[in-house]
Amino acid sequence: MPVKVRIALDAMGGDFGPSVIVPGAAISLGRHPDAEFLLFGDSALIEKELAAHPALKKVSRVIHTDVAVSMHDKPSQALRRGRKVSSMWLAIEAVKKGEADVAVSAGNTGALMAMARFCLRTLPGIDRPAIAATWPTVRGDSVVLDLGATIGGDAAHLKALAVMGAAMASVLFDLERPTVGLLNIGVEEIKGGEEIREAAELLRAMQSPRFEFVGFVEGDGIGKGAADVIVSEGFSGNIALKAAEGTARQISEYLKAAMSRTWRSKIGYLFARDAFKALKDKMDPNKSNGGVFLGLNGIVVKSHGGTSADGFAYAVDVGYDMVRYDLLTKINQTLNREAGALVSTPTAQEAVS
C-alpha cells in the first residue's frame, strides 16, 4: 500500500478543463492530505488555476501538452490524434508506468474507454471494461454497472460484469456475500431478451460462494436497493443513470418552487430547513460522481464532463478510495477464483459518447 496516493489528472478533460479540474483536486486534497497529483495539460492554464490553491500546488507536478481530446472526438479519432501525446493518454500512461496509482478524467467517455483499454489492456478474458459506480438507495448504496462503457453484450459478458461488480461491492461495503441482480423489464423469469435470460441461468448455475444471485430487478428496484449489485449492459445502464440524475434535479426544482410559492410555504420551509437540506444532499448527483473502469490492468475513474468543482472532487475521492481499498488487487483475486466467468465478449461494442 503506497504511503502517498498518487493521482494523475487529465486537466483538459470535460466541458471546463482546468477551471474545474484544479479547484476540484484542491477540494479533494482537503479531505485526503496524503494525496499528490500529476496534472497533464496546458501548463499555462493549469498554473494560473494552481496559483489560487497553494496547498495543492505544493503537492502537484504539471506535465505540459498542447493536445487535448475533445468531447466530440470519436474513439478512433482520439486514438489516432491523441495517442502518446494528449492529456488523457498521458494521465492513463502514468498509471501504466507506475508513476501514478489512479487516473481521473472528465473527458469523452468513448475516447477514455478506448485509450484505457489500448494503454492498460484488459484482464484475461475481459474484452472491454465496464463503468461501475455507487448508487444511493433507501437501503444505503449499491454498485451499478455497466453505466456506458460498452453497448450490448452476450450472457457471458453480463456474467463477468456480475463477478466484477460483486468484488467491488465486497470491498466497498465490507460484505462477505453481496447480492447481485440483473436489470430487466420485469422480475419474472420469462421477461427480457435472450441474452439476459441466459445470463440469469449462468449466474444461478454458478452458485458462487462470493455472491448471491437474486434474479431480475426492475428499474425502480435500483433506488429501492433491491440488490447490492445491479448489472446491466451499458446502453440500458447509461439511460437509467441519466434518467435518475434528471429526476433528482427535477424534484429539487419542484421543491424549490413549492417552498417559495406563498408566505406560509416559506415559513414552513424555515421549520423544515434541516430536513430539506438532508434530502437535497442525498439527491445531489455530484455526490455520486465518479465511475470506475473495471476490467483493466490499472485504475481509471470517469467523471461527468459537465460537473462542477465539487462534483469533480467526488470523482477524485472515488479514485483515492479505490487505491486505499486496494480494489484492483482484490478484484483480480476474485476474478481468478471465478475463472469461468472470464470469457471474451465479441458482441460488446464501444460506447461513443
Swiss-Prot record:
Catalyzes the reversible formation of acyl-phosphate (acyl-PO(4)) from acyl-[acyl-carrier-protein] (acyl-ACP). This enzyme utilizes acyl-ACP as fatty acyl donor, but not acyl-CoA. It holds the Pfam family FA_synthesis. Keywords: Cytoplasm, Lipid biosynthesis, Lipid metabolism, Phospholipid biosynthesis, Phospholipid metabolism, Transferase. Its EC number is 2.3.1.274. GO terms for cellular component: cytoplasm. GO terms for biological process: fatty acid biosynthetic process; phospholipid biosynthetic process. This is Phosphate acyltransferase. It comes from the Bacteria. HAMAP family: PlsX. It catalyses: a fatty acyl-[ACP] + phosphate = an acyl phosphate + holo-[ACP].
